[in-house]
């Protein structure tokens, strides 16, 4: 199995954790300029991907019922609230007219990012969607 953790803000602590579990733990750093496949660097214990694509993929997993959630409970309600706290918006560059989607945080999103990292780790094994290829 593989674990993906946020590389920020405590890079030193996350790097130590990844080193203790070398080959199984990867620090994630989102790269807004990256498109397509994730970049897994086994030596540096880093995975990079586009944040918007990653959040899109984790939401598709829920929407497409690739993940079975437990029965409705207070914890599942909190999970849903955190998932909804990352809202997708369309930005348009005033100068060029170029349009691009991105996610903005509207509230607590800890479960949203944790689920995205878990799906990212699982996608590397299963090659789920384009983001995991």
For the regions a protein language model found, what residue spans apply to each?
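Mg2+-dependent endonuclease catalytic cores in nucleic-acid-processing enzymes, primarily RNase H-like
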Residues: 1-95
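Charge-patterned, long linear interaction tracts outside catalytic cores
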Residues: 66-132
């Amino acid at each position: 199995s593989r674990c993906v953790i946020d590389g920020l803000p405590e890079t030193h602590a996350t790097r130590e954790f990844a080193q203790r579990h070398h080959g199984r733990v990867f620090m994630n750093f989102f790269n807004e300029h990256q498109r397509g496949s994730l970049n897994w660097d086994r030596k540096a214990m880093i995975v990079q991907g586009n944040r918007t694509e990653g959040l899109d993929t984790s939401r598709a997993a829920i929407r497409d019922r690739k993940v079975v959630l437990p029965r409705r409970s207070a914890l599942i309600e909190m999970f849903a609230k955190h998932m909804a706290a990352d809202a997708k918006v369309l930005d348009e560059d005033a100068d060029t007219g170029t349009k691009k989607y991105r996610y903005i945080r509207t509230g607590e999103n800890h479960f949203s990012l944790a689920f995205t990292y878990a799906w990212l780790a699982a996608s590397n094994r299963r090659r789920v969607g384009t983001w995991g290829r």
